[in-house]
Amino acid sequence: MLSKSLISKSLLFNSNNNNNTINESSIIIVQTQLNTITNKSTTSTFYYTRPQWGL
């Protein structure tokens, strides 16, 4: 099982430095890793902010 610190570091590393939002692709990767390591078919829900374009 991934530790919370490892997950936090992964999200922080993949975050956007300009507006501190997390990329959708990063969330999907982390969710896939969690499901693989725990070997469960459960779905984890992540909350994130989509990048705002054309502002």
Curated annotation (Swiss-Prot):
What protein am I looking at? Putative uncharacterized protein DDB_G0290013
